[in-house]
Amino acid sequence: MGTTLYKIVEQPKLNGGYVRKRIAWNNETLRQDYGKDYIGSVPKYDGFCTVPEHVSYQPVIGKFLNLYEPIPHQPQEGDFPSVRSLVEHIFGEQYELGMDYLQLLYLQPIQKLPILLLVSEERNTGKSTFLNFLKALFQNNVTFNTNEDFRSQFNSDWAGKLLIVVDEVLLSRREDSERLKNLSTALSYKVEAKGKDRDEIAFFAKFVLCSNNEYLPVIIDAGETRYWVRKIDRLQSDDTDFLQ
């Protein structure tokens, strides 16, 4: 990549399986592992890009390697009782809007969408299950953030994701809420990593926030239209194998 070597590795996951990662490598180690002539066969790119697409995904665009990850799922016609049950529980009377939301994430990943805020003081409501479902659906294009991640100046690990989800949000400071609102409608954003120059990229991330605080998880002004708030009821039954 430019003048830097990367190695693709398969990192074991806690629940089984592996996740592909790209780690920095060097010429000397490459020669030791594969011989001096191997470097000539290594693919070369001018740089990275981030172009989200699920239907016609391209791993390489021109001479740039696409950092957006492909997802292995292919839509199929048929019944989907488990997913439908979860979406009905989360979105209730707005079920059709919830299905539209998921469809837009898949078909139009650069489309701006409202900040989805799921709140409930009760336990066992399925909020975390819904976040894990989104992660299972869109895989490495979903990242779990903490409240502190939004306040950090370093954002390179989440700025190029489709979905940024927070399992227990508490951004009750005015500056936190303003930053979140601005990000939800921003077309570009400056990425910053430790030891590297800032770089401006297209920003297409959507936010899904969960909270047990029904009254002030974030500051929402009267008339604000950038939030979609859903109060989630307790689950009537608990399917612990849903994501399997």
For the regions a protein language model found, what residue spans apply to each?
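Conserved ATPase-coupling elements of RecA-like P-loop NTPase cores
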Residues: 172-177, 219-220
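N-terminal nucleic-acid engagement/recognition segments and initiation subdomains in replication
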Residues: 1-93
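Walker B catalytic acidic pair
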Residues: 167-169, 179
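A short helix-turn-beta junction within AAA+ P-loop NTPase domains corresponding to the substrate/partner-engaging
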Residues: 218-237
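AAA+/SF3 P-loop NTPase mechanochemical coupling elements
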Residues: 154-159, 192-210
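P-loop NTPase catalytic core of nucleic-acid-dependent motor ATPases
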Residues: 54-163, 177, 228-231
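Conserved catalytic/switch belt of AAA+ P-loop NTPases
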Residues: 177-199
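Short glycine-/polar-rich loops that comprise or flank the Walker A/P-loop
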Residues: 159-162, 186, 203-206, 222-228
